[in-house]
C-alpha cells in the first residue's frame, strides 16, 4: 500500500449530500469573519461540525441472511410489540418495533437491515415533534419502505424530528437490496423504526447503542452464527 493510499484510508469519507451545507457554512464564515473576526471562528466550528455530521464511514457488515442488522446509528429507544403503520400495508397483526434515535452527533447514513427486494416506498407528510416521543411514529413526517426478504416482509421507517426537516431515500421500488447497503439519510437529528416479525430472536435492548450495518438487532435462526461472513463497505 502506498503512502497516499494510507493517508486516504485514514480519513472518514464525507457523503456528497453534505457538500452544499459544508460549502455554505464555510462561505458564510468568510463573509461574517470579514465583518467581525470572531464570527469567522464560530462559522468554522459549524463547518467542522457539518463535516462530522455528514461523515460516511465504511462498516464491517455481517453477511448472514438470517440476521437483521441495525439500519441506523444511535440509541435503542423502543423495543416493543405494536401494529405497524397502515401505509406500510403489513396488516393488523402485531410486529416487533425497534426504534433507533439519532441525535445531532450520530452518523445519519441509513443502511438496509436485511437483503431482499423493495416492495414499496411511501412518504407521509406530518409534524416535526421530538423524535424520541412514541407519538412521533404516528404524527411526524416519515418515509416508509417495505423489504420482502426470504423470511417475509420487514418495514423500515425514516422519521423526521424537531430539527430534522429533510428525509432522503435513494432506494426505489423493485430494487434488489443487500444487508448493509446505504439507502438514505435524515438531516440533523431523527429516528428510524424497523418492524420485524414476532418470531425473531431479539439481540438488543432499550438503551443500547447501535451501529448501522454492524449491530445485530435480531435473528431468525439461533444456529446461523456458524455460517457468518463479513463485508467491508
From Swiss-Prot:
Residue ranges crossing the lipid bilayer per the database entry: none
Record-level Gene Ontology MF annotations: phosphatidylserine decarboxylase activity
Active site (catalytic residues): 190
Cofactor(s) the protein requires to work: pyruvate
Catalytic activity, as annotated: a 1,2-diacyl-sn-glycero-3-phospho-L-serine + H(+) = a 1,2-diacyl-sn-glycero-3-phosphoethanolamine + CO2
Subcellular location field: Cell membrane
One of the record's GO cellular component terms: plasma membrane
Note on how the cofactor is bound: Binds 1 pyruvoyl group covalently per subunit.
Site keyed Cleavage (non-hydrolytic): positions: 189-190
Enzyme Commission number, as recorded: 4.1.1.65
InterPro entries named in the record: PS_Dcarbxylase (IPR003817), PSD-A (IPR033175)
Membrane topology, as annotated: Peripheral membrane protein
The record's account of how the chain is modified after translation: Is synthesized initially as an inactive proenzyme. Formation of the active enzyme involves a self-maturation process in which the active site pyruvoyl group is generated from an internal serine residue via an autocatalytic post-translational modification. Two non-identical subunits are generated from the proenzyme in this reaction, and the pyruvate is formed at the N-terminus of the alpha chain, which is derived from the carboxyl end of the proenzyme.
One GO BP: phosphatidylethanolamine biosynthetic process
Any matching Pfam family: PS_Dcarbxylase
Modification Pyruvic acid (Ser) occurs at: 190
Keywords: Cell membrane, Decarboxylase, Lipid biosynthesis, Lipid metabolism, Lyase, Membrane, Phospholipid biosynthesis, Phospholipid metabolism, Pyruvate, Zymogen
NCBIfam families on file: PRK05305.1-1, PRK05305.1-2, PRK05305.1-3, PRK05305.2-5
Function as written in the Swiss-Prot or TrEMBL entry: Catalyzes the formation of phosphatidylethanolamine (PtdEtn) from phosphatidylserine (PtdSer).
Family: Belongs to the phosphatidylserine decarboxylase family. PSD-A subfamily.
HAMAP family, per database record: PS_decarb_PSD_A
Subunit structure: Heterodimer of a large membrane-associated beta subunit and a small pyruvoyl-containing alpha subunit.
Protein name as annotated: Phosphatidylserine decarboxylase proenzyme
Source species of the chain: Bartonella quintana (strain Toulouse) (Rochalimaea quintana)
Protein encoded by which gene: psd
Amino acid at each position: 500500500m502506498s503512502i497516499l493510499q494510507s493517508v486516504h484510508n485514514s480519513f472518514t469519507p464525507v457523503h456528497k449530500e453534505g457538500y452544499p451545507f459544508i460549502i455554505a457554512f464555510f462561505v458564510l464564515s468568510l463573509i461574517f469573519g470579514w465583518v467581525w473576526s470572531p464570527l469567522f471562528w464560530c462559522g468554522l466550528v459549524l463547518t467542522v461540525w457539518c463535516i462530522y455530521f455528514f461523515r460516511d464511514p465504511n462498516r464491517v457488515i455481517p453477511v448472514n441472511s438470517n440476521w437483521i442488522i441495525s439500519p441506523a446509528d444511535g440509541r435503542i429507544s423502543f423495543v416493543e410489540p405494536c401494529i405497524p403503520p397502515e401505509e406500510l400495508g403489513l396488516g393488523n397483526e402485531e410486529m416487533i418495533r425497534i426504534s433507533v434515535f439519532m441525535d445531532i452527533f450520530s452518523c445519519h447514513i441509513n443502511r438496509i437491515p436485511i437483503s431482499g427486494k423493495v416492495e414499496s416506498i411511501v412518504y407521509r407528510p406530518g409534524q416535526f415533534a421530538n423524535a424520541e416521543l412514541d407519538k412521533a411514529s404516528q404524527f411526524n413526517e416519515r418515509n416508509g419502505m417495505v423489504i420482502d426478504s426470504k423470511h417475509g416482509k420487514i418495514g423500515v421507517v425514516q422519521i423526521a424530528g424537531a430539527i430534522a426537516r429533510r428525509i432522503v431515500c435513494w432506494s426505489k421500488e423493485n430494487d434488489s437490496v443487500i444487508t448493509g447497503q446505504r439507502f438514505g439519510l435524515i438531516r440533523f437529528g431523527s429516528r428510524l423504526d424497523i418492524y420485524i416479525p414476532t418470531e425473531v430472536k431479539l439481540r438488543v435492548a432499550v438503551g443500547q447503542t447501535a451501529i448501522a450495518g454492524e449491530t445485530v438487532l435480531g435473528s431468525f435462526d439461533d444456529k446461523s452464527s456458524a455460517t457468518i461472513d463479513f463485508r467491508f463497505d
